[in-house]
Amino acid sequence: MNYIPTQTFYGRRWRPRPAARPWPLQATPVAPVVPDFQAQQMQQLISAVNALTMRQNAIAPARPPKPKKKKTTKPKPKTQPKKINGKTQQQKKKDKQADKKKKKPGKRERMCMKIENDCIFEVKHEGKVTGYACLVGDKVMKPAHVKGVIDNADLAKLAFKKSSKYDLECAQIPVHMRSDASKYTHEKPEGHYNWHHGAVQYSGGRFTIPTGAGKPGDSGRPIFDNKGRVVAIVLGGANEGSRTALSVVTWNKDMVTRVTPEGSEEWSAPLITAMCVLANATFPCFQPPCVPCCYENNAEATLRMLEDNVDRPGYYDLLQAALTCRNGTRHRRSVSQHFNVYKATRPYIAYCADCGAGHSCHSPVAIEAVRSEATDGMLKIQFSAQIGIDKSDNHDYTKIRYADGHAIENAVRSSLKVATSGDCFVHGTMGHFILAKCPPGEFLQVSIQDTRNAVRACRIQYHHDPQPVGREKFTIRPHYGKEIPCTTYQQTTAETVEEIDMHMPPDTPDRTLLSQQSGNVKITVGGKKVKYNCTCGTGNVGTTNSDMTINTCLIEQCHVSVTDHKKWQFNSPFVPRADEPARKGKVHIPFPLDNITCRVPMAREPTVIHGKREVTLHLHPDHPTLFSYRTLGEDPQYHEEWVTAAVERTIPVPVDGMEYHWGNNDPVRLWSQLTTEGKPHGWPHQIVQYYYGLYPAATVSAVVGMSLLALISIFASCYMLVAARSKCLTPYALTPGAAVPWTLGILCCAPRAHAASVAETMAYLWDQNQALFWLEFAAPVACILIITYCLRNVLCCCKSLSFLSATEPRGHRQSLRTFDSNAERGGVPV
């Protein structure tokens, strides 16, 4: 909780032990003491003289004390002390001594002043101290009702969090001021505690002080225990006779508690008294000292006075004083006190476009305005009748008073009905206002049943489509769920900061008051105040409260209107204005918009199946539930839908992340993990597969580049091998009788000569070298074994001799021969 400060361990009167030095201290060598023989002799001499003096005093006899002389005082004649302003000089001296004794603070007060010197700061408004702010733990606390700014440059610029529940404003203490803060404690054994004005008694969970010890301006002062810890902060007090009960904010073990005795008043210092004016004379608005300042004594003059002061700061104090006629005395407020302002107002008849039968009329229940700022779907309806007060200006919550012609009639509140597409549930009523929760619809109707059992109704076109609280369309508030912030119209009749304008009603013409009697016109007022203006004769203009007859006149020559300037009515655009439209009054309206928390259900958690860069959600809603998701990258993409049945949704999860929100559950954020197939340290194809899953474009580029490099290397190697073979075999081909070495023949795959056939060659080998003949049969077997081994291990790099011989161009083939000494044969092929 923000209003429970954290204990700090910075003591003002405690000095910590200095830090130990990490290096050993080296002992400084002590200089040798040189004995001073002269000083020793002088000391011995002084000791001997002192001993001799003490011995002589002991031997001398003690003298008896001298007898004290008694002072003889002459009797003085008694003189009567002079009286100054009804008090003698002695009494005046005693009063001064008593004042001096009172001004000297006691032990408790001195201790509190010593602690308060560091942890308390004045709150000033226009240079005047209105209260105090206190540093407790790691927070600075100031009563919310204290107007002004803390008299400290660092604390004045802090951002405070306000709590109307505890009447506190709280902010974090700057780091450099934490050493000045006081500790707090929740331990409060019964006994006496200390504050600025002395002792505070704590008993039965209440803090009390002697009456007169505290006063307005002490709001925000702390109460300390004997260890200097804060146990409570004073907000105000309630006078209970000899003692005053304090209204405080204190701490329990795990929570903050506000103790407010009955009848307690806030102890912020009063600001400049608001002044009102009457006939060029000023007076305090809350205490009018004039005769027409009571509505019950002179209603019309009182309303005129209120209209003259409508724009002054103390207007509502003047209104309260004029309606209660308290003249400075304070009255206990009650629920009926909130309805007291309506005795200066009256219901009225206004134009209504649809009176329930498809035609317009002047209805006593005309709808003026409909407000729907509340997020919970509550409607605040204003209409022309008044609820909670009867026609005798008495508070009665079972009555509705409405205008019936010039008269005011009562109806039963239970006959009030509000409807849209269906009947609405009425939550609260007061004055001109109704609180109701209605189903969706395209119109709004308000109706009552009058004294003749006739239905008086008014209907207006109004589109009402209440949005659900939260993200689920539920019909019944659950027992368990989640608390989310919302707004509603507070169901209280107390005064609010909202207000409506009132004005004096105009004169209403009424020809029914005129009757023709044998050439004369009779005006029957019926207890009303009537203005008349007849053109027959002279002087037939005026105002009357009783029946009168105008001689020798016709009804057509007279104009009669009922005037009533004893009550205000709402300044409606559907009602004619009075003769002076600039004059108006104001009254507070009930049911303010309040920030609260609403309990909403929580949808069942979805079943989540994770995939590769995607997630699959199985959604099972109990009622229409909103499902939405969005990406978390630089360009977020948002999607939402209302889910009414069990569905399955697969949504992508990019690398930047994704957030999905299901119903009133907390949003969930997911990021795709860098996973892929293959192995980073496996076979080549596994390595390629692994990196292709992570970086597909880079992997393809790398594989293509390596393949091109390998092909270029292979072609270059083949070209270099062919060139080297040609360079190696050309000299032997051009040199007659040159023999190719067998190693070079194997490396260069030298082709055999075509001088003799296979049979001739085999016959020659049989005759000349039979060992080589048998090796010729072993050569095919060896070739088969080599080819099999190469195919098995896939390590064959060279082509077969016949393949290289077949691929070589025919024109470039050379026959290698070797010759002996027989010139006729021309040589023998090898």
UniProtKB/Swiss-Prot annotation:
A lipid is attached at residues 718, 728, 748-749 (S-palmitoyl cysteine). The chain crosses the membrane at residues 702-722, 771-791, 793-813. Changing residue 330 to S: Complete loss of p62 precursor processing. Residues 94-106 are annotated as: Ribosome-binding. GO terms for molecular function: serine-type endopeptidase activity; structural molecule activity. The record marks 267-268, 333-334, 755-756 as: Cleavage. GO terms for cellular component: host cell cytoplasm; host cell nucleus; host cell plasma membrane; membrane; T=4 icosahedral viral capsid; viral envelope; virion membrane. It catalyses: Autocatalytic release of the core protein from the N-terminus of the togavirus structural polyprotein by hydrolysis of a -Trp-|-Ser- bond. Residues 58-109 are annotated as: Disordered. It holds the Pfam family Alpha_E1_glycop. SUPFAM superfamilies: Trypsin-like serine proteases (SSF50494). PROSITE patterns: ALPHAVIRUS_CP. The active site is at residues 145, 167, 219. Its EC number is 3.4.21.90. Keywords: Autocatalytic cleavage, Capsid protein, Clathrin-mediated endocytosis of virus by host, Cleavage on pair of basic residues, Disulfide bond, Fusion of virus membrane with host endosomal membrane, Fusion of virus membrane with host membrane, Glycoprotein, Host cell membrane, Host cytoplasm, Host membrane, Host nucleus, Host-virus interaction, Hydrolase, Lipoprotein, Membrane, Palmitate, Protease, Serine protease, T=4 icosahedral capsid protein, Transmembrane, Transmembrane helix, Viral attachment to host cell, Viral envelope protein, Viral penetration into host cytoplasm, Virion, Virus endocytosis by host, Virus entry into host cell. Residues 119-267 form the Peptidase S3 domain. GO terms for biological process: clathrin-dependent endocytosis of virus by host cell; fusion of virus membrane with host endosome membrane; proteolysis; symbiont-mediated suppression of host toll-like receptor signaling pathway; viral translational frameshifting; virion attachment to host cell. Residues 65-107 have a biased composition (Basic residues). This is Frameshifted structural polyprotein. It comes from Semliki forest virus.
